[in-house]
Amino acid sequence: MPVRFVSLIGLLLLACGAGESPYPSPAQTYGTYKDAVLGDRPHEVWACFSARYRQLEYEDSLERWLAAWPVERATRQEAVRRLQIQQEKLINDRIGFLRFDDSTVEADASPFFYFVQEEDGWKVTTHLDPAFRQALEQAVAEGEFRLPFAR
């Protein structure tokens, strides 16, 4: 009887973990994004994007994103196959970034993925996201982060 009880508790704990967010950190969000891109699952890719990114890039239109996916798919798949994370940096509890190894980044591409913390976890955004920029400026002003080129 005690063995059954322990087994039941173990199963319950596993079931509880199954409902965890796929976006607990920038690196794990990127992993979720990468799996969705390689698995040709555009709805899951969309879920990795921040609300502001969706608005800025696709006018917050899932239909627009789904129409763009066939055009963007190959480029995104090639990129996620190539990119290797060099650094994960949480600037504070609101923003962070991933820096990719320069040898894995195309010459005309940014070596960074930017992230914002939303209600359901860390989401991909763009450096053009006004909320990201404002949070970054505030982090710099408060000494939470120093821009690499700043003295």
Language model feature labels by segment:
Residues 21-22, 27-32, 37, 42-95, ...:
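Short solvent-exposed beta->alpha transition segments
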Residues 91-95, 104-110, 118-119, 123-151:
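Low-complexity, intrinsically disordered terminal/linker segments enriched in charged
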Residues 87, 112-114:
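Short, surface-exposed charged micro-motifs
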Residues 82, 110-112:
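Well-ordered beta-strand positions in beta-sheet-rich domains
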Residues 13-15:
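C-terminal motif of bacterial Sec signal peptides marking the signal peptidase cleavage site
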Residues 100-101:
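N-terminal acidic leader/helix
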Residues 18:
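Short, conserved catalytic or interaction motifs in soluble domains
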Residues 2-9:
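Sec-dependent signal peptide recognition
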